[in-house]
């Protein structure tokens, strides 16, 4: 399943790129602070798993995702996550009921930052290489997440290192993360402040054999 998914991704990238630029093996880059909209799609079945606004602090490695109220095709509460990658924990927040779960985060890898072990594959143009206003120059990176045995491919802009999309696949899941309406700043720093009803919450024990990471969290919504 993983091999097929990555082969399909390669074909999609080739069809989407109208001109190939010479690659000089760029150095690993770091995303800026960002505010934007993140959409998560399961490629098996085409289901939109979640879509909503996020804030990402690239310095302190903090991410807040709040699901859009437009995505109401499910009976559960709207997803609201605060992920503290440096601390290795995340909070599942229910603002409506003022409840909170605190759980371990077993991997630092996520779709809004190029993972540390990402290997550069190619630099190319999306759009037209002759009309400057109609193209975007991007890098494609690939790698794997040791903690989850998943593989990923990340599309970042050349220069700012904005992650436009991330493809992630394991033997059991295949997800596409799309990043849009990006502003390179954190507009509301208070989004990273833990709600008062979460402050005294104890860390829940992770079931044996389970790994909590950014990708699996969105797969289960």
From Swiss-Prot:
Domain of life: Eukaryota
Keywords: Calcium, Glycoprotein, Secreted, Signal
Expression sites by tissue: EPDs are synthesized in the meninx and secreted in the cerebrospinal fluid.
InterPro entries referenced in this protein's UniProt entry, alphabetically: Ependymin, Ependymin_CS
SMART domains attached to this UniProt entry: EPEND
Description of post-translational modifications: Binds calcium through the terminal sialic acids.
Gene: epd2
The family this protein is said to belong to: Belongs to the ependymin family.
The keyword Glycoprotein belongs to this UniProt entry's keyword annotation: yes
Species of origin: Salmo salar (Atlantic salmon)
Record protein name field: Ependymin-2
GO-annotated cellular components: extracellular region; lysosome
GO molecular function, one term: calcium ion binding
Positions annotated as glycosylated: 33, 73, 97
One of the GO BP terms on file: cell-matrix adhesion
Secretion signal, residue range per the UniProt entry: 1-21
Subcellular location: Secreted
Function text: May play a role in neural plasticity. May be involved during axon regeneration.
Signal is among the record's keywords: yes
């Amino acid at each position: 399943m993983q091999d097929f998914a990555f082969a399909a991704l390669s074909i999609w990238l080739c069809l989407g790129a109208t001109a190939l630029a010479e690659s000089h093996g760029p150095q690993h880059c770091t995303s800026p602070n960002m505010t934007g909209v993140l959409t998560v799609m399961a490629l098996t079945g085409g289901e939109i798993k979640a879509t909503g606004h996020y804030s990402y602090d690239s310095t302190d490695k903090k991410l807040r995702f709040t699901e859009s109220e437009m995505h109401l095709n499910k009976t559960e509460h709207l997803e609201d996550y605060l992920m503290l990658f440096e601390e290795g924990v995340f909070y599942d927040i229910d603002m409506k009921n003022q409840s909170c779960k605190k759980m371990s985060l077993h991997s630092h890898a996520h779709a809004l930052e190029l993972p540390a072990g990402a290997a550069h594959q190619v630099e190319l143009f999306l759009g037209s290489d002759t009309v400057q206003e109609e193209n975007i120059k991007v890098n494609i990176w690939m790698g794997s997440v040791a903690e989850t045995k998943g593989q990923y491919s990340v599309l970042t802009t050349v220069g700012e290192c904005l992650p436009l999309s991330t493809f992630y696949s394991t033997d059991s899941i295949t997800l596409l993360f799309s990043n849009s309406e990006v502003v390179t700043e954190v507009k509301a720093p208070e989004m990273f402040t833990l709600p008062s009803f979460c402050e005294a919450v104890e860390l829940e024990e992770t079931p044996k054999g389970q790994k909590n990471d950014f990708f699996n969290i969105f797969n289960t919504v």
